[in-house]
Amino acid sequence: MEGKIIQVLGPVVDVEFESYLPAIFEALDINFEVNGVQKSLVLEVAAHLGGNRVRAIAMDMTEGLVRNQIVKARGKMIEVPVGEEVLGRIFNVVGESIDNLEPLKPSLTWPIHRKAPSFEQQSTKTEMFETGIKVIDLLAPYSKGGKVGLFGGAGVGKTVIIMELIHNVAYKHNGYSVFAGVGERTREGNDLYFEMKEGGVLDKVALCYGQMNEPPGARNRIAFTGLTMAEYFRDEKGLDVLMFIDNIFRYAQSGAEMSALLGRIPSAVGYQPTLAGEMGKLQERIASTKNGSITSVQAVYVPADDLTDPAPASVFAHLDATTVLNRKIAEKGIYPAVDPLDSTSRILSPQMIGEKHYEIATGIQQVLQKYKDLQDIIAILGLDELSEEDKKIVERARKIEKFLSQPFFVAEVFTGSPGKYVTLQETLEGFGGILEGKYDHIPENAFYMVGSIQEVLEKAKNMKNS
């Protein structure tokens, strides 16, 4: 099953076979030499050109390829290692370890293109996924097997939230996580690895990187590599897995680059005509089955802050919750810098999370919204000009703002304060009490960077004694 190269167009390679036609998505291998160095390259068949000619996408740089070089058809798709041996390791798109450790000899591999779970296999019951992060659990709760969009600019704490979620899933749910770096900066991928090592969560996570400097084929398919590893834990081990994709926009962007090279006519804003279908193909595989679930957190870059751009717009259709990080909140020193009024969740309704949770969440949002509306008056006239009722609202809102902050386990190394996991029960008790006015007598500084309301009371007591 050998063929030869007839044309190289950047990351796209045309191959002709004599008596064999490889299937779409089949892997092809090329072994060649560049400046005396042996190299191997994997291609994936993307289109049939007629006759026994195929157009394939390269999963690595194509420098050094020449016409008439021998290409071998694998007879199967790209397969990547799965199972517990992938934890704590970094992989590239074709499943090779790239962390300079002992190369992995996998005992089990799965193809990266797989069918989404059928209707019979899917689980339809909606269950809340407790993260242990107060602001998320209270105001924009995640659902098991749901998809969450994490929106935020540079330096507001997306990575820290991702690491904390990985930590909490590992320690409280005894679960595993998979991180797919799609079109990531190499530096960020490197930082994440070492931060996870320091944070002690590396042995519970598998990392797959297709970085910014790699060809579009690698950046696009890396999402499937990570997803396949997560699917194994869901289907074979019956676990609830967390799947992180950073950044889902780059998945769409690399698809657009590939589409142009394959000669397809572009659609709106130069994107591929198959954008919605490609996004659906990936997102539909992220689902809850009767065995286990994959809950995904996807960082979404919004080009030029335009939410109507086809790429982010195609992601929105699939999301169950959005966690929006706000720089203004980060500047106040409140971490995690989640915007309590901008973040949304599909399961924030009395039928899904219960009457009590819903009432407390909407009550908190009303107080914060009222405080936001009063800011102009306070700026012009000062606090003293407000009515007694409004003064009370401002006091409570400031306490709520401070109480939405929380020390993280993975940030212990930097902050020096031990991390806190707050159960939903404790979160509701604390915020419910603030709304009822139970803690009106406690100074607002006692609410800053603590876990449960019990700690607030202890902190207030210590402040009083000192």
Curated annotation (Swiss-Prot):
Produces ATP from ADP in the presence of a proton gradient across the membrane. The catalytic sites are hosted primarily by the beta subunits. InterPro entries: AAA+_ATPase (IPR003593), ATP-synt_VA_C (IPR055190), ATP_synth_F1_bsu (IPR005722), ATPase_a/bsu_AS (IPR020003), ATPase_alpha/beta_chains (IPR050053), ATPase_F1/V1/A1_a/bsu_N (IPR004100), ATPase_F1/V1/A1_a/bsu_N_sf (IPR036121), ATPase_F1/V1/A1_a/bsu_nucl-bd (IPR000194). GO terms for molecular function: ATP binding; ATP hydrolysis activity; proton-transporting ATP synthase activity, rotational mechanism. F-type ATPases have 2 components, CF(1) - the catalytic core - and CF(0) - the membrane proton channel. CF(1) has five subunits: alpha(3), beta(3), gamma(1), delta(1), epsilon(1). CF(0) has three main subunits: a(1), b(2) and c(9-12). The alpha and beta chains form an alternating ring which encloses part of the gamma chain. CF(1) is attached to CF(0) by a central stalk formed by the gamma and epsilon chains, while a peripheral stalk is formed by the delta and b chains. ATP binds at G152, G153, A154, G155, V156, G157, K158, T159. CDD domains: ATP-synt_F1_beta_C (cd18110), ATP-synt_F1_beta_N (cd18115), F1-ATPase_beta_CD (cd01133). It is a peripheral membrane protein. It catalyses: ATP + H2O + 4 H(+)(in) = ADP + phosphate + 5 H(+)(out). It is an enzyme of class 7 (translocase). Belongs to the ATPase alpha/beta chains family. It comes from Helicobacter pylori (strain HPAG1). NCBIfam families: atpD (TIGR01039). Its EC number is 7.1.2.2. This is ATP synthase subunit beta. SUPFAM superfamilies: C-terminal domain of alpha and beta subunits of F1 ATP synthase, N-terminal domain of alpha and beta subunits of F1 ATP synthase, P-loop containing nucleoside triphosphate hydrolases. Gene3D superfamilies: 2.40.10.170, Bovine Mitochondrial F1-atpase, Atp Synthase Beta Chain, Chain D, domain 3 (1.10.1140.10), P-loop containing nucleotide triphosphate hydrolases (3.40.50.300). Keywords: ATP synthesis, ATP-binding, Cell inner membrane, Cell membrane, CF(1), Hydrogen ion transport, Ion transport, Membrane, Nucleotide-binding, Translocase, Transport. It is found in: Cell inner membrane. Coiled coil: none annotated. The keyword DNA-binding does not apply.
